[in-house]
Design a protein with these regions (language model features):
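C-terminal boundary/linker of central alpha/beta nucleotide-binding cores
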Residues: 1-44, 48, 94-105, 118
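Short, flexible, mixed-charge acidic loops at enzyme active sites
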Residues: 19, 56, 177
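Amphipathic alpha-helical dimerization/coiled-coil segments
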Residues: 37-71
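Short, well-ordered secondary-structure microsegments
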Residues: 53-57, 66-153
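Short coil/linker segments at helix-helix boundaries
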Residues: 56, 60, 64, 154-165
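Alpha-helical solenoid repeat scaffolds, predominantly canonical TPR units
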Residues: 79, 100, 120, 162, ...
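Amphipathic alpha-helical segments of tetratricopeptide repeats
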Residues: 84-85, 125-129, 166-178
């Protein structure tokens, strides 16, 4: 496919090659997917895969050198954006949208995609008006704190308020657990 100019090779993390569809081929494939009726299934798989990928990388964030961590996720920035669009387009996926957002602020800030961080910071929190499972509300507040205090994407006062809410939720959780 590469020889016929249908895909291009791009370097992936660890210098292994990754393949990317050329724009015209990607557009044609998207049209065919929509026509087949399988688009919702494929979109759900993309969202699940991206959540799994972010969960894996989020867990390695404190231990990994920053540039290596960014190199693992940077090739998937278009997939991450597409996963956000999928999650935001379907109200039944609100919890997944919040989870995706809660796992991604370090990437948006440190990779220089602050506009994306702001876009998702404006779109996602309104989805969290109802109850959220487990520690997701605290992780949402921590994500907003990162964007407001480290990334300067949100006003610092908003980031600080989010950090305070996350700390209060953690204190409450510790009291309940003990």
């Amino acid at each position: 496919l590469r020889d016929k100019s249908l895909v291009q090779t791009v370097p992936g993390p660890g210098h292994e090659p990754r393949f990317r569809l050329m724009d015209s081929v990607r557009q044609h494939a998207a049209e065919q997917l929509a026509a087949s009726g399988d688009e919702p299934t494929a979109a759900g798989r993309l969202l699940s895969w991206m959540l799994q990928r972010l969960a894996e990388l989020d867990g390695r964030f404190p231990q990994m050198p920053m540039m290596a961590w960014l190199a693992c996720l940077r090739p998937d920035v278009d997939n991450l954006r597409a996963a956000f669009r999928v999650a935001l387009a379907d109200p039944s996926r609100a919890v997944q949208a919040v989870d995706l957002f809660a796992r991604s602020p370090n990437f948006w800030v440190r990779a220089g995609f602050k506009h994306d961080g702001l876009l998702w910071a404006q779109a996602v929190p309104p989805l969290a008006a109802g109850p959220l499972p487990g520690d997701l509300r605290a992780r949402l507040d921590l994500a907003l704190a990162v964007l407001g205090t480290i990334g300067w994407v949100l006003p610092p006062a908003q980031g600080l308020a989010a950090a305070e809410r996350a700390a209060l939720l953690e204190k409450t959780r510790q009291r309940i657990d003990s």
